[in-house]
């Protein structure tokens, strides 16, 4: 499956991917940590409350000092709550010399939850036998 990336226009172009596209890759059998890395840059209390399975967790404030934990041979999809800290993390990693491909998850966890498949309707109990 090819990456569907968008480059945003601006001072610094940044590759982005939607939550739906990440979900599609996971549904197609790709696993976070094998063909790509999901990097969660939120704070530990945020991650404890809610996380994407398989994400590597490095808070924004530690991302540069811990960039050696990231595999530059794999695409790294960076996410946070809404997409702001992940953009900061990408910029910081680039400035620090990280050579791998960095992609921002557009909208972060908010978009992740909005992209979740709708829950199936609750089934009705079987009709009572009134005989």
Placement of each model-derived feature along the sequence:
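Rhodanese-like catalytic fold shared by cysteine-dependent sulfurtransferases
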Residues: 1-37, 41-77, 84-131
């Amino acid at each position: 499956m090819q990456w569907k990336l968008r480059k945003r226009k601006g001072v610094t172009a940044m590759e982005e991917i939607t939550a739906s596209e990440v979900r599609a890759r996971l549904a197609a059998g790709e696993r976070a940590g094998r063909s790509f890395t999901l990097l969660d840059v939120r704070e530990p209390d945020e991650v404890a409350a809610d996380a994407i399975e398989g994400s590597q967790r490095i808070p924004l404030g530690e991302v540069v000092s811990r960039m050696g934990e990231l595999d530059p041979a794999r695409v790294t999809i960076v996410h946070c709550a809404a997409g702001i800290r992940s953009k900061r993390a990408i910029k910081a990693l680039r400035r620090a010399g990280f050579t791998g491909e960095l992609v921002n998850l557009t909208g972060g966890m908010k978009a992740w939850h909005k992209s979740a498949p709708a829950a199936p309707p609750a089934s009705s109990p079987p009709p009572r036998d009134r005989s």
